Amino acid sequence: MKITKIFVAILALCAFAACEPNNGNNGGGGVDDVWSDNGSPVGEWVLTEWNSSKDLPFGVYLQLNEDNTFDLYQHTSSVLWVHYTGTYSLNGTTLSGVYSDGESWATSYTIKYSKVAEPKQILLTSPDNKGIYTATTIPDAVIDQATEAVVVRSGESKRFL
């Protein structure tokens, strides 16, 4: 009986010693425990978290294609979906882009990839913002109802990226 108690105490001590501190990240260590620098941004994405908020008053879908072109569908200041196109480049972990009218994205983003298989996610951070995008299929209704950016009134055309 005494040996059993000692054995249980040793096991508990070993388990306690193996634990890492939380560091305020919901059960994990730092950001590198969840995100990796290795991955591919190619795919269809929906913005699911913006600056730590999951309750978004706007919608953003982003399609990054293998040929370094992108399609951005957004409704930010109206209920209209607006469609933008352009090209993007990935230099290490820096993602930047240029709209088809020649205007650059508002900023470049550091990109990281989720380490978990499902749901597949990417994290885009800039000096002022952090967005988490989750892999999805862009709904046909969004694509079909989107207004091309060139015909949108200027008050509704503030670009998300």
Model-derived features with residue positions:
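Positively charged n-region of N-terminal signal peptides that target proteins for export
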Residues: 1-5
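C-terminal motif of bacterial Sec signal peptides marking the signal peptidase cleavage site
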Residues: 15-18
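Lipid interaction determinants
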Residues: 21-84, 94-161
